[in-house]
Structure formats: C-alpha cells, structure tokens
Amino acid sequence: MNETNKTLVGPSELPTASAVAPGPGTGARAWPVLVGFVLGAVVLSLLIALAAKCHLCRRYHASYRHRPLPETGRGGRPQVAEDEDDDGFIEDNYIQPGTGELGTEGSRDHFSL
C-alpha cells in the first residue's frame, strides 16, 4: 500500500451518538404509530358505546326478541282442564308421600363399616 491511501482520523473527527440521525426503520416512528393505534382504539370503542346508547341497531336487535305467537281462533291448542290440586309445584315421585318417617332411630343401625 502506498502512503497516499492511508489517512489518519483524529478523535475530533469521529461521529458522536448525538450527531448520528436515526434511520427510518428505527424507533423514531414508534411513538406516532403507538399513539395512533391507541387513539384509534379509543375512538372505535366510543363509537360502539354511542351506537349502543342511541339504539342505532334496534331494528336488527328486534328480530332476536322471542315472543309467543299471537293466538288465533283456529288451529290453536285445545284447552286442557287444570287439576284441582295444581299448586304450581312439580311433584317429586322419588319420595312417595306417607312412606317412612324422618325420625326413625333404627335406620342408623343398619349400616356398619
């Protein structure tokens, strides 16, 4: 190598960290993207809340309401006579009424370990 190609660089000529500008692919654009994403999410949630508050989708929601069909004169169910003892409770046939007493002392003695 010849002497003309060798150049010495002094410490004052080296680039410092403050002099180097960040490139377009670094974290310089991270804050605007993050702020834009957060603002977009907030605006979208506010629009959804406003639509729910003002009942903008009421006609679409009305099809999900379930109501009994209106009674017509023909083709309806025949009227069934209700029993006299119908008190609104469902009877449990597992335990028959009148069989066994609750306070029997001998029932504990039948089981042994």
From Swiss-Prot:
Glycosylated at which positions?
A: 5
UniProt key word Cell membrane: yes
Major localisation: membrane
The record's subcellular location field reads:
Membrane; Early endosome; Recycling endosome; Cell membrane
Topological type in the membrane: Single-pass type III membrane protein
Biased composition of type Acidic residues is found at 81-90
Residues in the Extracellular compartment per record: 1-29
Protein name (record): Type III endosome membrane protein TEMP
